[in-house]
Amino acid sequence: LTATPIPRTLNAALSSFRDLSLIETPPENRKSIITKITEWDDNIIRDSIEREVDRGGQIYFVHNDIKTMNSIKLKLSMISPKLNIGIIHAQLDNRAIENQMNKFINKEYDLVICSSIIESGLDITNVNTIIINDCHKFGLSQLHQIRGRVGRTSRQAYSYLIIPNKYKISSV
């Protein structure tokens, strides 16, 4: 078992040390996250960013390759020139991470390019669009966890899973 609460609680319930409760419905007024899988498309990315900014929200752009984050920032700046963009990843020192997160929370940034550092523990209710670049490099449970960073209020949330153009999307 890990140190996370779910396995510990499950172990306690199965061992009869604790009762098991089930949550079968989402919180009242909670909407399902609309998830789209797409190849990189400047128009789709621009539209998703502009829709969120126009309604006063913010965006996570997950890009798990720290070496190329600055080139992604440049590319996003060209797609949406008025965007205020921050960068957060685990190779920053703690003070820099905290500084960048505070700027994002205080709405100095419209979008933050980040690594999977956001996977757990963040609950910023104003962030309701997440774009996950190169989603094929993540596991399914990791994608689900990262996607869960949005949609934490009654506001409609969107998740865009970006795959490289060289892969084909088959219809189900």
Segments from the language model and where they lie:
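Inter-lobe coupling/hinge segments of SF2-like helicase ATPases
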Residues: 1-172
